[in-house]
Design a protein with these regions (language model features):
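Helix-terminus/linker motif at the lipid-water interface of multi-pass membrane proteins
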Residues: 1-28
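Juxtamembrane/interface segments at transmembrane-helix termini
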Residues: 34-49, 133-145, 187-198
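Specific pore-lining/lateral-gate transmembrane helices of multi-pass inner-membrane transport
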Residues: 24-101
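Interfacial segments at transmembrane-helix termini and the short loops linking adjacent helices
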Residues: 93-122
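Alpha-helical transmembrane segments of multipass membrane proteins
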Residues: 31, 35, 87, 91, ...
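C-terminal transmembrane helix end/exit motif
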Residues: 159-164, 171, 176-231
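Extracellular/periplasmic helix-loop-helix junctions in multi-pass membrane proteins
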Residues: 6-16, 101-110, 145, 156-175
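Short runs within selected transmembrane alpha-helices of multi-pass transporters and secretion channels
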Residues: 112-137, 143-154, 169-184
Length: 232
């Protein structure tokens, strides 16, 4: 209902797109914080912990290093969420005042979209940070599950919201971001609860070669490439 045709198959929704773009800027604090604080504080402990496994560290040192690493991780994630919470609250509180000075033509509907999407992007930013930590611990299945849960929930609930009043647009993304945040956080808590087993017990005893669909496709194309045929 709020979409407009720009030209041909190119459509836009200015009443939604402009608030969405501005709301997205509110998560820059988390993006920067992950690089300058979370990784800076967490990675040295992470490297020390894994090097003890690789270099034959004693059990006591491994346990102490693991506890320190997880304590730093929990603290940094808490501060990240707190910074994003304060940023989101501040942006929502000041948006009516600031938008009044900008020639963007904000109406009540756009103000509602902006506030809804600020909350959604805040949850998404923190959830995405937790997902990146899952990748640090090589929990690819957990990270994939969290990403798919976000994609499915956001797409499904957004499609459902199209059946209601346009004032409810954006709540589908907000709910999907909440699902991502909770899924990634619960997965990280479960994964790190018994980290030594995850590192040692879930690794294969002998090396295994796994060939998925894309690997087989690549090998097939390589065998049938013109260069291979010329060499044959």
């Amino acid at each position: 209902p709020i979409g407009v045709q720009v030209k041909g198959l190119f459509y836009g929704a200015p009443y939604y797109d402009v608030p969405a773009l501005l709301a997205f800027l509110s998560i820059l604090v988390t993006t920067v914080n992950f690089v300058v604080s979370v990784e800076v504080q967490f990675y040295p402990r992470y490297r020390t912990y894994y090097s003890l496994f690789n270099d034959g560290g004693v059990v006591g040192d491994i346990t102490a290093a693991g506890e320190e690493m997880l304590a730093v991780l929990n603290r940094e994630l808490f501060y990240t969420a707190l910074k994003q919470l304060f940023t989101t609250a501040g942006v929502i509180s000041l948006e009516a005042l600031v938008m009044g000075y900008l020639p963007l033509g904000f109406n009540d509907l756009m103000h509602g979209y902006f506030r809804t999407l600020c909350v959604g992007y805040g949850l998404y930013a923190v959830g995405n940070t937790v997902l990146l930590i899952l990748l640090y611990f090589t929990d690819y299945k957990g990270a994939l599950g969290a990403a798919l849960s976000f994609a499915g929930a956001a797409a499904g609930l957004t499609a459902l919201s199209l059946r209601f009043d346009p004032a409810y647009y954006g709540f589908g993304f907000l709910a999907g971001a909440a699902v991502l945040f909770l899924t990634a956080l619960l997965r990280l808590d479960r994964f790190t609860r018994n980290l030594p087993y995850r590192i040692l017990g879930q690794q294969p005893v002998v090396a295994e070669e796994k060939a998925g669909a894309f690997t087989r496709l690549g090998l097939f194309l390589e065998r049938h490439s013109p260069q291979k045929k010329e060499e044959a």
